[in-house]
Amino acid sequence: MTEEEISLVLNTFMYIDYKEADDGMTMNEILEELSRHPDCQEGGIHFGEYTVLTQAARNPEIGSLVIDNQSCLMGYDSGTAACTFGSEETGTLYVVYRGTGDGEWPDNGLGMTAESTRQQERALEYFEDAVERGGISKERRVIVTGHSKGGNKAQFVTMSTKYDDLVDACYNIDGQGFSESAIAGWKEEYGRDGYEERRRRITGIFGENDYVNVLGNSIVPEDQVYYVKTPVQVKNFAGYHDVKYMFASLEQDPRTGEYVTVFGGTKNDYVPGRGDLGSYAAALSCFLMQMPPEQRDGCAATLMQLMELGGGRKTGLNGEKLTLSDIGDFISAGIPAIYRSVFLTGQGRDMLAAAFHQKTFSQDMKGHMILMTDYSLMAGQVQALSQMASQVRKRMREVRETADRLPCFVKNNWILCRSLKGEAQRLEREAESLEELSGLLEEIVKLYMERDVKVSQLW
């Protein structure tokens, strides 16, 4: 098997998130344990991944790999999720980072504007820790790889580690790119030649319709980008960014006539380029990256927080929270960017055509489709929020007046007075937040009204 194929298999393993393996176990020994786990049995949530692994492990190049340096046994947080797999026969060592874990979506958003993020830095710390603990030398071939967020981390490690002479290759599977400031920082630190030398080690392997690798600024050399066929049923949107679908095929059930997904242990063929969804995602990313950094930061933060909420978390792993300004950036700039990328680009029209099973949309959208923005609800909320702020301020004044009217002997009760003053301050902060939100919504309504005027002039 090629290094690329082995990397894809190991990235599939990472999503089982099995923490009961002991360092020193082979892949075959781990799979034997997993065979008794309900999640890996037919109908279990990881049956697809397990099927890929068991079939791939028939090849001793996979089955004999030895796991080591598991981050969960080294004191790292749940977001780091990394380990190494070594081949005793060839001496090759694979350093593998799992994709976006619990609480990591906001960190993805920060990577769109920041030079580095907390989770990227922890990934680097893990790599250098593993090198020093394991006494890894130049005699071993070292491969760094990861999928999605893990692919971004693998690239970051390749570009940032002080042990750059140990990294022979990096396989980025569906991983996003970086901010302008991150790239500028590397160029300044290493010089143009040093920057190019490091990034030439990176190979990008992307699903044909993956929608994550296009985010940010790619540092993968264009001649080292490959797209893999990922047959995904239309209703399974998440499958386009799922590494196991690089091992999938759609087969017709002879009994029902419907197509079902079947997983195997061999990587699918490469295809010439992106599919319709992948091309649209790239166009949308271009619109986002053209925004001023502060607006882009707000849009990215909102999108990533929505992804985090989908997983049941209200804050990021490192305590990241949305601000009113972030939400305002998304509504005023992010939604219009999505509109432009869907309706005003060829990639967006092709994506819609594929979604609705039509062959093509007219290149001239004028007279064929109208985007209607009903901002009356937002406008109504402006006044409602303003009235609510007034009511809160009234309550604040009542609390302060009550505190002032207290008899002297009661005012000497330090705990009571402090409680009343604290409540008044809390109410004041709440009123200020409501007023800020009201003002923000008012500005957004104005922006949409101006956009409607501009659109009406086009028709």
Predicted regions and their residues:
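N-terminal low-complexity, Ser/Thr- and acidic-residue-enriched intrinsically disordered segments
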Residues: 1-46
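Short amphipathic alpha-helical segments that mediate assembly, nucleic-acid/protein binding
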Residues: 6, 27, 49-50, 58, ...
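A conserved cap/lid and substrate-binding interface adjacent to the catalytic center
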Residues: 35-142, 161, 165-171, 180, ...
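Long, contiguous hydrophobic alpha-helical segments, chiefly transmembrane helices and signal peptides
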Residues: 95-97, 108-109, 144-145, 149-155, ...
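Conserved aromatic-histidine-acidic binding/catalytic patches
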Residues: 111-118, 141, 145, 425, ...
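Serine-dependent carboxylesterase/thioesterase catalytic core
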Residues: 121-124, 128-218
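Charged, amphipathic alpha-helical linkers/stalks
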Residues: 200-206, 212-329
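N-terminal secretion-targeting helices of virulence/extracellular proteins
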Residues: 280-459
